[in-house]
Amino acid sequence: MKKKAGILTTYFAANYGAMLQPFALKRVLEQQGCDVEVIRYGQPDIVKSYSPFYWGRYFQAKVTSAIAAWLFAPWAIAKELRFRRFMYRYINGEQGFAKEIPADKDVYYVGSDQLWRTFGKDEHFDPVYMGFFETRPGARKVSYAVSGEHLELNAVNQEYLRRAMANFDMISVREQTRADDFAPLAGGKPVEVVLDPTLLATPDLFAELESRDPLPGKRYAVFYCVRRSQRFIHRIYEYVQAKGLELVVFSEGFKPSLISFALRHRGVHYLMTAGEEAFLGAMRYAECVFTPSFHGSVFAIINHRDLYSLLVEDGHDTRTRHLLSLLGMEHRLWAIGQPMQTSEIDYDRAEASLKQLREHSMDFIHRSLN
């Protein structure tokens, strides 16, 4: 009889990595013979942050933010609908959010992504992501590759985490720094470091997904802009001009400075409403990739692209630093004031490291199911 597995994560956010990681974990578990459901839990703070249909964003305290939300609403809605089509096709075909966590699973996987952190102005934890939900007797709760980069480990948070970790039968995180932080709070349970699902899955799984080349027949670079990395755009443009490339730009949210830059510079294509299909195609066909994004770096690595991992130096570069250090690619980290590194990436070495890390991560999955 098939084991029933449930996944709790930010599957609904119109963000490239947020949807690709639950797809990957779902398919890996299905390959282990599981009946898998990505549970339709909509974490309220994340829903409000991403959804253009949350009307509160149009009446914000900051007038400039409210005006920007109104101006970009048509593009935000178009992008949201593209991501929803992907979600219904590949992740969970049911619309809306579940009113409660289904209690019929044998194993519940919480992860991956930034789930073990605080949300909102009052800095609260999400009780579901922290394992405070009812299950049938004998069901297991497992954290898989959770991250908590945006988390202050003060005394109050440590006490909450200590109680929350008691909910879990097995614990794994994505970064060694968090494993070191959480180990004293885990009640003696080991806190293991495992690969993000997008790297746990073998690359052939992503061939199942529809993708399209956003600039067929053209040579181009990709800039995936998240956080405040738009300040790199002039340096990136100098590089692509010197190489005779065009530039395809993706972003999280909408960046007015990038709109202006694309209008004023030849060969810059800012794909404001692009969905997963264009992202996957661009990561496959681009000659090089510039991004501070963890998942942007992941898909450049999967496709053996020439990666420049941008250091925004805002306190949130930990995840990418850790990944590149595991793969012997630290030389591809680039801060704005530094010269670009042009030495080649040794992808044979990186793949050898990934093979070992996949084996350990799959061992964790096997133990969680048995």
Q: Which residue stretches match the model-derived regions?
A:
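Active-site anion-handling motifs in enzyme catalytic cores
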Residues: 1-370
